[in-house]
Amino acid sequence: MNPPDDLRAIFFYGKLEDNWIGHQMAEIWKDGVYRPFLPLIKEGTVALDIGANIGLVSLYLSKYFEKIISLEPSEKHFECLNKNLVGHNITNVKPIKKALFIKGGPLPFGGPSDNTTMRSLHTAPWQDSKSDATVECITIDKLFEDEKIERVSLLKLDVEGSETEIVSSDSFARVADKIDCIVGERHAWSGRHPHQLDDALKNNGFSIEKILNDANLFVAKRK
């Protein structure tokens, strides 16, 4: 399945060769990573696109969910996210310029100079990776409270190394039973072993369904 005909020009930040846009579009539309979860969508629930980047997943899911909340802390990527939503006349996605983490407040944020897509609260293991900005953070239970979220059918979690900390946190435990399914990406370079993420998910009532591809995308569903 290729991107739909009504997918218009995509705004992105940086050089095309430094981005994973082609890979991401193939993953979403051709490989259909999110397609198996569409039948699980329950009326009145929302989707959370955490680490929305330029909004490709939000664009895809906007056709199926009544409401999507998209978090993206990077200034440049957030600008592109907004432009892509406006350019495609998407009105059911709420973009929020924050990072999801285990505590709120401002924190240093950065990444390697040759990869404009890779931005993280963690220092990646590349020689030139450095923090070059400060971003506002929010915990997941505070996000639920602020946005009055009752139920999440799908949580997309791509937080560049913070996934284990988030899923292991007390704030996640407080809302875990309101989440039906998680599609996320593992980042072993954060210093966490993959089994720590698996254990945290299981402790919060999720079962690991499968690893989807070589990008270490995982699927976890509520037991």
Language model segments and positions:
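Phosphate/nucleotide-binding beta-alpha loop and adjacent structural elements of enzyme active sites
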Residues: M1-K223
